[in-house]
A protein has these predicted regions:
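Periplasmic c-type cytochrome electron-transfer domains
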Residues: 1-192
Length: 192
């Protein structure tokens, strides 16, 4: 069970009374919105940095087996970085996937409507053309997402922050979740 308050003060509750109960025709699930700030910086981390930090066989004997998550991107394998379970290799692909899965819009990346084989009405429904979102619009959204800056750190008590950072390293989180990265060059956003 999970419960809490939305900013407007509206109470919400999710309770699984019987997790083995079959789902009905319609199923819903709670979602946590992904963090959007700083995604442009993550997109610019060179693949070599991520591959270099991987240790799938625990060669350094620290009991952590960090792995690179590879995804199919067109005809090539790339590192998954964005979306649930890191299923998208770039911020542009993540945005196109969100337009397809969350909004039902086609792009040059995802040309087919978000319909299953069992939804013939969905496949024949009117739409805004193919693709519905132009490459220039997809690129504009990607540029906007790339430029969303990480806010300044707001820490009232720096000693508490430093203790948290120290614990993050001590328990081994920093072995996979590298605290500092250097971005690669960006032609569109050279200041990143």
């Amino acid at each position: 069970a999970s419960n809490g308050n939305q900013p407007a003060g509206v109470q919400f509750d999710f309770t699984a009374t019987d997790p083995n109960q079959p789902l009905g025709d319609t199923a819903i699930s709670g979602r946590i919105s992904p963090q959007l700030v700083g995604m442009g910086l993550l997109d610019l981390i060179p693949e070599a940095n991520i591959i270099g930090a991987a240790d799938p066989d625990d060669n350094n004997k620290n009991d952590i087996s960090g792995r690179v998550h590879w995804v199919q991107d067109g005809k090539q394998q790339r590192i998954g970085r964005f979306g649930w379970k890191a299923i998208n290799s770039s911020l542009r692909t993540q945005n196109a996937n969100a337009m397809s899965q969350d909004m039902g819009l086609t792009t040059s990346v995802f040309m087919d409507p978000n319909c299953t084989a069992n939804q013939p009405i969905c496949w024949t429904a009117p739409n805004g053309g193919t693709p519905e979102v132009s490459d220039s619009s997809l690129d504009a959204v990607t540029d906007f997402m790339t430029a969303l800056a990480v806010p300044e750190r707001r820490v009232a008590d720096l000693s508490t922050f430093n203790k948290g950072a120290q614990l993050f390293t001590q328990v081994g989180c920093a072995s996979c979740h590298t605290p500092k990265q250097k971005t690669g060059a960006s032609v569109r956003f050279p200041l990143l």
